[in-house]
Curated annotation (Swiss-Prot):
<comment type="similarity">
    <text>Belongs to the CGI121/TPRKB family.</text>
</comment>
<keyword id="KW-0804">Transcription</keyword>
<dbReference type="Pfam" id="PF08617">
    <property type="entry name" value="CGI-121"/>
</dbReference>
<comment type="function">
    <text>Component of the EKC/KEOPS complex that is required for the formation of a threonylcarbamoyl group on adenosine at position 37 (t(6)A37) in tRNAs that read codons beginning with adenine. The complex is probably involved in the transfer of the threonylcarbamoyl moiety of threonylcarbamoyl-AMP (TC-AMP) to the N6 group of A37. CGI121 acts as an allosteric effector that regulates the t(6)A activity of the complex. The EKC/KEOPS complex also promotes both telomere uncapping and telomere elongation. The complex is required for efficient recruitment of transcriptional coactivators.</text>
</comment>
<keyword id="KW-0158">Chromosome</keyword>
<comment type="subunit">
    <text>Component of the EKC/KEOPS complex composed of at least BUD32, CGI121, GON7, KAE1 and PCC1; the whole complex dimerizes.</text>
</comment>
<keyword id="KW-0010">Activator</keyword>
<dbReference type="GO" id="GO:0005634">
    <property type="term" value="C:nucleus"/>
</dbReference>
<dbReference type="GO" id="GO:0000781">
    <property type="term" value="C:chromosome, telomeric region"/>
</dbReference>
<keyword id="KW-0779">Telomere</keyword>
<keyword id="KW-0539">Nucleus</keyword>
<protein>
    <recommendedName>
        <fullName>EKC/KEOPS complex subunit CGI121</fullName>
    </recommendedName>
</protein>
<dbReference type="GO" id="GO:0000408">
    <property type="term" value="C:EKC/KEOPS complex"/>
</dbReference>
<dbReference type="GO" id="GO:0002949">
    <property type="term" value="P:tRNA threonylcarbamoyladenosine modification"/>
</dbReference>
<dbReference type="InterPro" id="IPR036504">
    <property type="entry name" value="CGI121/TPRKB_sf"/>
</dbReference>
<dbReference type="InterPro" id="IPR013926">
    <property type="entry name" value="CGI121/TPRKB"/>
</dbReference>
<dbReference type="GO" id="GO:0005829">
    <property type="term" value="C:cytosol"/>
</dbReference>
Length: 157
């Protein structure tokens, strides 16, 4: 599962196409953060993700919640961020896993429901270096201390 852009479908949800990109040396995270509600992507701080499996699990859960009308957020993309969190608090999930003002390594998720949207052209509005989506790349940017902090349920902090 390595490549510059990871593009795949989940077998039981063939109507969704998932695109995952990773950027390093991002210079416009403040601009992206100010437009989060307008842009049809999930922007995730790469320091909080250690593997493709972790990300794929969150994407799968977000699609499940969408398909069974159990979404707790407004979009499938924000549902991906919530699905990374051990907490069910949306604001807390966005603060822990979403991008911040100075975020320099970003993971971008774009989920397209094939019947409803135009094909994705790969433009995620990120000014940075596109790097391969792989466990090796995630492990270089992941901060294990931050991961320990964000993955502890809120009542344990």
């Amino acid at each position: 599962m390595a490549g510059i852009v990871l593009k795949y479908k989940i077998p039981q949800f063939q109507e969704y196409t998932i695109h995952v990109q990773k950027y390093n040396n991002v210079t416009n995270s403040s601009e992206l953060r100010s437009k989060l509600a307008e842009l049809p992507f999930a922007y995730i701080d790469s320091k909080t993700v250690i593997s493709v499996e972790q990300l794929s699990s969150a994407i799968y859960k977000a699609i499940l919640e969408t398909e069974y009308n159990r979404m707790r957020t407004r979009t499938i993309h924000s549902e991906c961020i919530l699905s990374l969190s051990p907490s069910s608090n949306i604001g807390d999930a966005l603060n822990r896993f979403g991008i911040k003002e100075g975020t320099t390594d970003i993971i971008v998720i774009k989920i397209i429901e094939d019947s409803n949207e135009e094909p994705y052209d790969g433009n995620a509005s990120v000014d940075g270096d596109l790097v391969p989506v792989s466990d090796d790349e995630f492990s270089t940017s992941a901060d294990k201390e931050i991961i320990k902090t964000v993955c502890i349920p809120c009542d344990k902090l």
